Design a protein with these regions (language model features):
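Hydrophobic/aromatic beta-strand elements that line small-molecule binding cavities or substrate pockets
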Residues: 93-98, 123-130
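A short hydrophobic beta-strand element
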Residues: 102-111
């Protein structure tokens, strides 16, 4: 009898450990969708990208640059062409990490490109929001404004030099 109870307990424990919760399934599905969108973005596969985003898709570039703002699909395509015109060569990026939730995931990458101002290596965080139909409805992008301005726009940023010994006094 003890063996039967022990065997039953082990079987139930094994089955409960092997079952993925609904939440985990949703997180995995979100991550899969987001990585497909990310790959399509980076490779320039507009057809695949379009098939994975919602009809009310928006993309938001944070910051204080002239290109910062929220774009719908058509204006995002125009923005992408403009961004590409600032580069020498292709868009490049090294995926570094992803943090996924049930309805959104944040992808971290190191952009590795060359712009009119020289080498452009900017750290990016992109939050992809996935709607109830499994389509990406919004991408929100964070990056260094200053690096973009100097390396892609060719602007010079000059600040006042502060003596390190007097900086916080």
């Amino acid at each position: 009898m003890k063996k039967l109870i022990l065997l039953l307990f082990i079987s139930i424990s094994f089955l409960s450990c092997s079952n993925i919760s609904e939440r985990e399934k949703k997180i995995n599905a979100t991550e899969e969708i987001v990585l497909k969108v990310y790959d399509a973005q980076l490779s320039g596969d507009v057809e695949t990208l379009k098939s994975l985003v919602s009809d009310d898709f928006t993309m938001t570039l944070t910051g204080k640059l002239d290109i910062s703002g929220t774009y719908d699909w058509d204006s995002y395509m125009e923005f992408s062409k403009y961004f590409g015109s600032l580069l020498i060569g292709e868009v490049g990026g090294e995926f570094t990490d992803i943090i996924s939730g049930e309805n959104a995931a944040v992808v971290f990458l190191n952009g590795k490109m060359e712009g009119i101002g020289g080498k452009y290596e900017n750290d990016y965080a992109l939050r992809y929001t996935v709607n109830s139909e499994g389509k990406v409805s919004n991408i929100k992008e964070w990056l260094s404004d200053i690096l973009l301005a100097t390396q892609l726009y060719g602007e010079e940023i000059s600040g006042q030099h502060v003596d390190p010994d007097k900086r916080f006094k």
